[in-house]
Amino acid sequence: MLCLYELQVTDSQSNSTLDPMFDDIPAQSSNTPLLNRRAGDGVRSLVVRTVAGPIEYFSVGEGPAILGMHGTPGGFDQVALIGETVEARGFRIVGWSRPGYLGTPLDVGRTPAQQADAAAALLDSLGIDRVCVYGASGGGPATYSFAARHPDRTWAMVTECAISKRFGDDLAPLQKMLLRAAINGLTVPIFDWLANRFPDTLARQMIRVEGTLDRRSARALSSQVSADPAKAAFVTGLFQTLNPLSLRKAGLLNDLDQFERIERLPLDQVECPALVIHGTHDSDVRFEHGEFAARSIRGAEFVAVEGGTHLLWVAQQAAELQARRLKFLRRHAPI
């Protein structure tokens, strides 16, 4: 039986021990309940006690289970956003807030291996035997670690623009500046204002920052996104999964620290069917991460999205990519 309760955020989730320069971001009030948090689309999260510690999660749909590992920063709400269309096609989506994000304390698991084991503990508590593990962006290390460490529980793996090796040393100066500004809470009010007043401008800025497209190509993609209500809503929704930053700061800082410590992820130990998707013009997690993963995982299917940025869900080929994902999932899903 699940043990559900109201989780209170305490000072134990503060990041002052990690880096005092980030103490200007206020911690969330300790009397804020996290039970029944809702994502932007109304998905409700719960907190379950596991052998690894308390974990915030959501579960929707029926059918073969897909476990989502969100990016950096993120939370269960990011998995809910990405999993909407898949859930509607006969799959159960289970998303969680990785340690340090929202309602999952950082002590549940700091390293990719620890987070993989914590995810397995979550599945135990939910009575789920096997899953397809899906990881995007900063969720890559935990995703690859889960598939390698828990092969008997993984019927397939899908990664998208995912980190597959050491990350952080190759960031461009502009990216480092934007990342520092984001961590210090300087960009959130600006982008929040853009999301509410000028969503088209927000889409243009996110596409510009998340890709290496030339100006003409970036403008063309922005126009396509603005003209498509579903894609425009996705961009706005994705931004909303970055807030409130005060409840994601611990996970963000831990992720950045862990990514720089990566020596070698257990890619060559992944035995399940694997689909690796990456955009050729991804400026956040560079294309070489996808190439490296595809080379290292035996039998992996590799989809190189020409002109794709870090936001493949709004790429020109978005419909084709969705069809490819579903085809892969249906081919390998347990009967």
Task: Report the location of each language-model feature.
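Conserved HGGG/HGGXW glycine-rich cap/lid loop of the alpha/beta-hydrolase fold
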Residues: F58-G103
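Glycine-rich "HGGG/HGxG" loop immediately N-terminal to the catalytic nucleophile
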Residues: P99-A113
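Conserved acidic catalytic loop of the alpha/beta-hydrolase fold
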Residues: Q114-V131
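Flexible "cap/lid" loop of the alpha/beta hydrolase fold
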Residues: M157-P189
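Alpha/beta-hydrolase
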Residues: L178, G185-L265
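Short beta-strand/loop motif that positions the catalytic acidic residue
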Residues: V270, V276-H278, D282
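Conserved alpha/beta-hydrolase "acid-adjacent" motif
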Residues: S283-H289
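Catalytic active-site module of serine/aspartate enzymes centered on a nucleophile-bearing elbow/loop
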Residues: A300-I335
